[in-house]
Amino acid sequence: MSLMDPLANALNHLSNCERVGKDVAYVQPASKLIGRVFKVMQDKGYMGNFEYIEDGKAGIYKVELTGHINKCGAVRPRYAVKKTEFEKFEKRYLPAKGFGLLIVSTPKGLMTHDEAKSNGLGGRLISYIY
């Protein structure tokens, strides 16, 4: 069976493990995009350390959970967002102003919507977390 959206599956797995109360989640298959999204989440304090484990196939990420994730998910379709349009998507995906993050793919790499706004960049919405 093939996976249609590995990022959505990875974020859903993190949400489920967090809800059940696990300390560690094993996410597979691993990809560069998933690793970069995890890096942004780690930098903002939503999860602890994560490491890549080679298993001879697609790889596995071992993620330490901290209990700070209420909900996270992938944004489908990947909407193109101008630097002035972030507020519309904040209202759609986040529960309150200033609470949570939208992760955006910009020409400068993955970053949060606040960083993209301050740098004057637009991009494509990848995921949300709060």
Swiss-Prot record:
Q: Name one GO molecular function term.
A: rRNA binding
GO CC, any one term = ribonucleoprotein complex
Key words of the record: Ribonucleoprotein, Ribosomal protein, RNA-binding, rRNA-binding
Its BP terms in the Gene Ontology are: translation
State what this protein does. Answer: One of the primary rRNA binding proteins, it binds directly to 16S rRNA central domain where it helps coordinate assembly of the platform of the 30S subunit.
Q: Which PANTHER family would you find in this protein's record? A: 40S RIBOSOMAL PROTEIN S15A (PTHR11758)
Quaternary structure (record): Part of the 30S ribosomal subunit.
What family is this protein classified in? Answer: Belongs to the universal ribosomal protein uS8 family.
Under what name is this protein listed?
Small ribosomal subunit protein uS8
Organism expressing this protein natively: Methanococcus aeolicus (strain ATCC BAA-1280 / DSM 17508 / OCM 812 / Nankai-3)
Higher taxonomy: Archaea, Methanobacteriati, Methanobacteriota, Methanomada group, Methanococci
